[in-house]
Structures are given as structure tokens and as C-alpha cells.
């Protein structure tokens, strides 16, 4: 076995990326404070051809040098928009036909491994602040909550790690 060189990875160009079909998934970042987490979400979203990222509240917007350290240019390939209020973002997405799930530990949440999706539908996931999580009002406007099963002593994962796990799972279910 031999590690591949970067030139052997057959990656598409940024121009080609803009034209290819995207996964019918929007990521909503609700008050994410860490530029590194935001950049990491951009990079993961690029890897799985996510349709768009909504940056809400205090979530910073590109371009930013600290964000670029983890995004590595994905902040220029993945479509994004800033929406001041995450509730407005959720309501707008629902009006556009998206099914919106907040990723939160909540009463009645669906475990990610039990979530069933319809490949003919469009979805959005809301990721919450690193300390407070998704705002309750945003949860109230969502179609439901999904949760990653955890078996250790901690009750949460880093938001960029959580986003990566959820995107990967939804990608497998929708692709």
C-alpha cells in the first residue's frame, strides 16, 4: 500500500465545485463563537458538497484569516449566507420546503443512527453555540431534534466534530 500524492486525488476545481450537484442539505450555525469551528464546518461541507451554510447571530463570516486556517479555502467554495436570527433562518428554510432538525439533546430527540430520511426531500441541520447549544426558540421552530448517541462520561462533543458526524451520516442516507 502506498500513500497517494495530492496530485493523484482527482479533486475537482473550485470552478467545477460551484457547478456540480450538491447534497440537498443546509447547515445552520447558530451563534458559533470559534473561528476554527466555523472553518472546520466549511471544510467538511466542501468535502460532502453541502448546498449552503447559514451563518447566524454572532457566527463570523468569511473572509477571516483565523477561519481560513481550518477552512483551507472551503469558505470560498461552499455557498453561505448570513442571517441575523437563527429562528428566521429556520422559518425561511421551512418555507422553502426544507425539513429542519436541530442537533440537540432534547426530550423526544431521534438518535442519529435511527433517523430515517426521504431521498426526495431537502434537509437542514442546526448546530448550536459551543456552550449553550441550540437556542430553545430555534428548537421550537424546528421539525425535530437529532442526537448522537454517546457512551462515555462527557455529555457533548465539539460542535465541528458533531457537525462532521451528522453530515457524514446524512450524506450516507441521502447520497
Identify what each model region corresponds to.
Residues 1-175:
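Post-transcriptional modification and biogenesis factors for structured RNAs
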Amino acid at each position: 500500500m502506498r500513500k497517494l500524492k495530492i496530485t493523484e486525488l482527482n479533486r475537482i476545481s473550485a470552478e467545477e465545485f460551484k457547478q456540480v450537484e450538491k447534497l440537498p442539505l443546509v447547515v445552520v450555525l447558530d451563534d458559533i463563537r470559534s473561528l476554527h469551528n466555523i472553518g472546520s464546518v466549511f471544510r467538511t461541507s466542501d468535502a460532502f458538497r453541502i448546498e449552503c451554510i447559514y451563518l447566524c447571530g454572532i457566527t463570523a463570516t468569511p473572509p477571516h484569516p483565523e477561519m481560513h486556517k481550518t477552512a483551507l479555502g472551503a469558505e470560498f467554495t461552499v455557498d453561505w449566507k448570513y442571517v441575523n436570527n437563527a429562528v428566521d433562518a429556520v422559518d425561511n428554510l421551512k418555507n422553502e420546503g426544507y425539513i429542519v432538525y436541530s442537533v440537540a439533546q432534547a426530550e423526544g430527540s431521534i438518535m442519529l443512527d435511527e433517523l430515517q430520511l426521504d431521498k426526495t426531500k431537502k434537509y437542514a441541520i442546526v448546530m448550536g453555540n459551543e456552550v449553550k447549544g441550540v437556542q430553545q426558540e430555534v428548537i421550537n421552530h424546528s421539525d425535530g431534534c437529532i442526537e448522537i448517541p454517546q457512551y462515555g462520561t462527557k455529555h457533548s462533543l465539539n460542535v465541528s466534530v458533531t457537525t462532521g458526524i451528522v453530515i457524514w451520516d446524512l450524506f450516507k442516507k441521502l447520497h
